[in-house]
């Protein structure tokens, strides 16, 4: 402090990564116009709310260093400006979360980061199953993208390796895969398979259920057709109560409670017009409800006796997320006729899978 510096003087050397405390080697060059009588180290960073004050005391050194403005990282746009741009070009039907809108600029593993550097533990965005920007996923994507981008009309080992590893995690009867681009496409295909296999059209669903945003899936999603802007339940959709052992009419996490809720499914399929009973193995949008024991098993038995099939929607709950099992339906020791997976199986990238029996396929 207080020493004069001439153009061309050496002011610093950059050491190796290890000498820099594990940080990327860099030069922290800061102009201070007023030390404010501070004896200790002058602040080198500041919270976003204090940025303008500290910038007035430590103006940008780019002119002194001869750095062109084009090399300076621009200040992030104001959230309100981004919101106005979004409102001009993106449908208002697509909502933005939270009263104080978040400008998220990147994600790393379990964290999201906003434009001001705040980190958020991501407990909402459920599609990056093994974390945002997971290095192993990025590496695998890069490897495949530089090798081949194609579809299923040609032979290629990768899709075969993937399907074989996937069905190895499932019950033996579930052995045929269909690959699509999303959970919505997967559920739509599952419905088509069920209707083709049974020759019937109707569907039994749980109250509060959500299975996708295509026209056919809105029609089997009470969360959508009973929600804001919904058109109500189609005649071919039959809604049964959520198997909620805490708030519902039957209490307790017992097999008796599960059997009691399954009787609603039995009544719904009794008329013989149903092609399928579709349910999330652990309903997500409906409230993160863990069904009581024996519910899915008993419901599947009733469904099959009526000539229909059981579709397990594992988009939100499958692939290890139950904790003690790999698939949600395994919690009740039941084998579905069709299993549906969505974007989480691609860590948020456009991928969905339908796995079913050879007879249905």
Predicted feature descriptions by range:
Residues 3-6, 16-19, 23-73:
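Acidic, glycine-rich catalytic/binding loops that coordinate metals and/or anionic ligands
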Residues 4, 9-10, 119, 344:
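Residue-level marker of beta-strand positions
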Residues 9-15, 359:
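Conserved "cap/hinge" positions at secondary-structure junctions
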Residues 10, 23-27, 273-275:
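A short pocket-lining beta-strand/turn micro-motif at the edge of beta-sheets
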Residues 14-19, 223-225:
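Short beta-turn/strand-loop junction motif enriched in small, turn-promoting residues
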Residues 73-361:
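Conserved N-terminal phosphate-binding loop of PLP-dependent enzymes in the Aspartate aminotransferase
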């Amino acid at each position: 402090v207080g020493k004069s510096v001439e153009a061309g003087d050496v002011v610093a050397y950059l050491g190796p990564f290890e000498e820099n405390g594990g940080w990327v080697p860099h030069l922290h060059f800061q102009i201070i116009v007023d030390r404010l009588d501070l004896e200790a180290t002058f602040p080198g960073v500041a919270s976003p709310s204090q940025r303008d004050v500290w910038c007035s005391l430590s103006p940008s050194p780019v002119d002194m260093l001869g750095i062109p403005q084009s090399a300076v990282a621009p200040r992030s746009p104001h959230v309100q400006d981004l919101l106005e741009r979004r409102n001009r070009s993106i449908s208002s039907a697509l909502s933005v979360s939270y009263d104080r809108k978040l400008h998220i600029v990147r994600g790393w593993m379990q964290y999201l980061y906003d434009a001001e550097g705040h980190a958020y533990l991501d407990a909402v965005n459920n599609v990056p199953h093994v974390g945002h920007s997971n290095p192993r996923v990025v590496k695998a994507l890069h490897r495949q993208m530089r090798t081949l981008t194609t579809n299923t009309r040609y032979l290629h080992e990768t899709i075969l390796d993937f399907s074989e590893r996937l069905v190895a995690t499932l019950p033996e009867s579930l052995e045929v895969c269909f690959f699509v681009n999303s959970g919505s496409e997967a559920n739509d295909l599952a419905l088509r398979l069920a209707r083709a296999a049974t020759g019937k059209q109707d569907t039994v669903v749980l109250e509060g259920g959500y299975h996708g945003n295509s026209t056919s899936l809105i029609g089997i999603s009470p969360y959508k057709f009973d929600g804001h802007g919904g058109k109500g339940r189609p005649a071919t959709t039959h809604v049964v109560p959520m198997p909620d052992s805490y708030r519902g009419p039957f209490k307790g996490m017992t097999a008796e409670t599960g059997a009691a809720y399954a009787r609603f499914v039995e009544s719904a399929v009794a008329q013989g017009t149903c092609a399928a009973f579709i349910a999330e193995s652990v309903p997500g949008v409906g409230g993160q409800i863990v069904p009581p024991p024996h519910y899915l098993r008993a419901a599947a038995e009733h469904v099959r006796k009526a000539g229909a099939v059981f579709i397990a929607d594992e988009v939100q709950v499958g692939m290890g997320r139950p904790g003690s099992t790999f698939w949600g339906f395994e919690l009740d020791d039941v084998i579905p006729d069709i299993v549906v997976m969505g974007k989480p199986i691609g860590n948020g990238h456009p991928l969905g899978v339908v796995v079913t029996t050879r007879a249905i396929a």
